[in-house]
From Swiss-Prot:
Active site: 56
Gene Ontology CC terms: cytoplasm
EC top class, as a word: oxidoreductase
GO molecular function per UniProt: aldo-keto reductase (NADPH) activity
Species of provenance: Gibberella moniliformis (strain M3125 / FGSC 7600)
EC number: 1.1.1.-
One Pfam family, short name: Aldo_ket_red
Annotated family: Belongs to the aldo/keto reductase family. Aldo/keto reductase 2 subfamily.
Induction: Expression is induced in response to 2-benzoxasolinone (BOA) exposure.
Its job: Aldo-keto reductase; part of the Fusarium detoxification of benzoxazolinone cluster 2 (FDB2) involved in the degradation of benzoxazolinones produced by the host plant. Maize, wheat, and rye produce the 2 benzoxazinone phytoanticipins 2,4-dihy-droxy-7-methoxy-1,4-benzoxazin-3-one (DIMBOA) and 2,4-dihydroxy-1,4-benzoxazin-3-one (DIBOA) that, due to their inherent instability once released, spontaneously degrade to the more stable corresponding benzoxazolinones, 6-methoxy-2-benzoxazolinone (MBOA) and 2-benzoxazolinone (BOA), respectively.
Gene3D superfamilies for the chain: NADP-dependent oxidoreductase domain
Keywords for the protein's UniProt record, in alphabetical order: NADP, Oxidoreductase
Name of protein: Aldo-keto reductase FVEG_12638
Length: 327
């Protein structure tokens, strides 16, 4: 049973909350009024480790969170992470230039209404050397514009080099029982070696590991849903992966909890902070109460067998997006 984890000098409740789906990627574009109930439920439950980004909207996601925090006067109760590194208001390309970082933090602060606790570079730009981007990010910390800095979806080599230039506090990357690539590419091991916190996004497999999976065919996704472009969700891969998810579902039934709860409890058992997203208050409660699930050593071993044997089919991003991860 894991109820909190260390983040630098803090103890943060886990799991946290990923706000991306409120306004980006999953076919959703919620108004403030539509998003408020799930944010309020998170606050009421004590789920206070929140994640957003400039590109989720663009700008809209940060603004919704900022408006909510002002309305409920709850800044002191929340840990807020955001991200730059994508030219969201321009052409959408990946950029890590010092000027971009310097400019985007100001917009983040304006939309949130305060300085974020943690500021990431969202994707790594191969055209900007770390010797330019990391000092620029570090300067935000030195100026008090963020307390912690991090990288997202970088390689183990990049994380190590960046940390040699300036202290990196966190790395965010995809991790779930459905996606364990960072166990084998060295990223998790490198983060642990360097004492860098690993934040797991997509801990429910971007929808595979939910209780009432509503999609029966790849054509069932909304037109704007990014999963229409992801090989893992298309063609025969869809049906193969759906069968794998059913294997995890059987384990959850034996545990007498929901599939998301056992999936999140398993991520926590790996010592990683997860940030599952949802737009529904009841799902928020379901996710957060995964902290009450205690997996036995035998159950962890059983799930590990499923994870290691039932490998999902297809890439986790489309060809274009794959070029900007693991760099």
């Amino acid at each position: 049973m894991v109820k909190s984890m260390r983040f630098r000098d803090l103890e943060v409740p886990t799991p946290g909350f990923g706000a991306m789906g409120i306004s980006f990627a999953l076919g959703n574009d919620l108004s403030y009024e539509e998003a408020e109930p799930v944010l309020l439920k998170a606050l009421e439950q004590g789920c206070t480790f929140w994640d957003t980004a400039v590109s989720y909207g663009p700008g809209k996601n940060e603004k919704i969170l900022g408006d909510f925090i002002r309305k409920y006067n709850c800044r002191d109760k929340l840990f807020i992470a955001s991200k730059c590194g994508i030219a969201a208001f321009e052409d959408g390309s990946v950029t890590n230039s010092a000027e971009h970082i310097k400019t985007y933090i100001e917009g983040t602060i304006e939309r949130l209404g305060f300085t974020p606790d943690l500021y990431y570079i969202h994707r790594m730009d191969p055209n900007t050397p770390l010797e330019e981007s990391i000092p620029a990010l570090d300067s935000l910390r030195k100026q008090g514009k963020t307390k912690y800095i991090g990288l997202s979806e970088c390689s183990a080599e990049t994380l190590r080099k960046a940390n040699s230039i300036a202290r990196i506090d966190a790395v965010q990357a995809e991790y779930s029982a459905f996606e364990t690539i960072h166990e084998t590419d060295g990223l998790i091991d490198t983060a642990r070696e360097l004492d860098i916190e690993f934040i797991a996004y997509g801990p429910l497999g971007h929808g595979w590991l939910v209780e009432d999976f509503p999609y029966q065919t790849p054509e069932d996704f909304a037109p704007e849903d990014y999963r229409r472009q992801i090989p893992k969700w298309q063609g025969e891969n869809f049906y193969a992966n759906k069968r794998i998810a059913d294997g995890f579902r059987e384990l959850a039934k034996r545990k007498k909890c929901t599939l998301p709860q056992v999936a999140l409890a398993w991520v926590a058992a790996q010592g990683l902070i997860s940030i599952p997203g949802t737009t529904k208050p009841e799902r928020l409660v379901e996710n957060f109460t995964s902290r009450d699930i205690e997996l036995t050593e035998e159950e962890i071993k059983d799930m590990r067998k499923l994870v290691d044997v039932l490998k999902p089919q297809g890439d986790r991003y489309n060809e274009v997006a794959m070029r900007s991860i693991g760099k």
